[in-house]
């Protein structure tokens, strides 16, 4: 099997995912998954598509990450891994879609508007 690549995005995080047959190693920006994401919850999010299909020990995954925070990055990786697994075996798509791993979460931070302190917050209104 050759290398399969896919792209995952979430908020401002962009994850380029490269999947090849191997023993289950995950490298993020040349660092191990455990050193990049100290939180077990974020590591769980990254591995969700692999665990759902039961293939966590079959593939080596290399990821280039840019932008965003830890949460956005982990969810971008999850989307990228799910897309790569679908490229490898398209029969897995319904199972991954039912778990919500294939859907791109398009929510982003709303921009600040002029004349307001934040995007939707307004300055205190004084009637008199």
From Swiss-Prot:
A single Gene Ontology CC term: cytosolic small ribosomal subunit
Basic residues bias spans: 109-128
GO molecular-function terms, A-Z: RNA binding; structural constituent of ribosome
Pfam families, sorted: Ribosomal_S9
Keywords recorded for this protein, A-Z: Ribonucleoprotein, Ribosomal protein
Region Disordered: start-end pairs: 106-128
Biological process (GO), any one: translation
Family membership noted in the UniProt record: Belongs to the universal ribosomal protein uS9 family.
PANTHER family found in the cross-reference section: RIBOSOMAL PROTEIN S9 (PTHR21569), SMALL RIBOSOMAL SUBUNIT PROTEIN US9M (PTHR21569:SF1)
Name the UniProt record assigns to this protein: Small ribosomal subunit protein uS9
Gene label: rpsI
């Amino acid at each position: 099997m050759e290398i399969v690549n896919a792209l995952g995005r979430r908020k401002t995080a962009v994850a380029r995912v490269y999947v090849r047959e191997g023993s289950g190693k995950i490298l993020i920006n040349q660092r191990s998954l455990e050193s990049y994401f100290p939180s077990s919850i974020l590591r769980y999010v990254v591995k969700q598509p692999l665990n759902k299909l039961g293939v966590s020990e079959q593939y080596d995954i290399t990821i280039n990450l840019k932008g965003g925070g830890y949460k956005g990055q982990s969810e971008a990786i999850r989307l990228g891994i799910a897309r790569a697994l679908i490229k490898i075996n398209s029969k897995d798509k319904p199972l991954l879609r039912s778990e919500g791993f294939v859907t791109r979460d398009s929510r982003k931070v709303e921009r600040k508007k002029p004349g307001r302190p934040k995007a939707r917050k307004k300055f205190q209104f004084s009637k008199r």
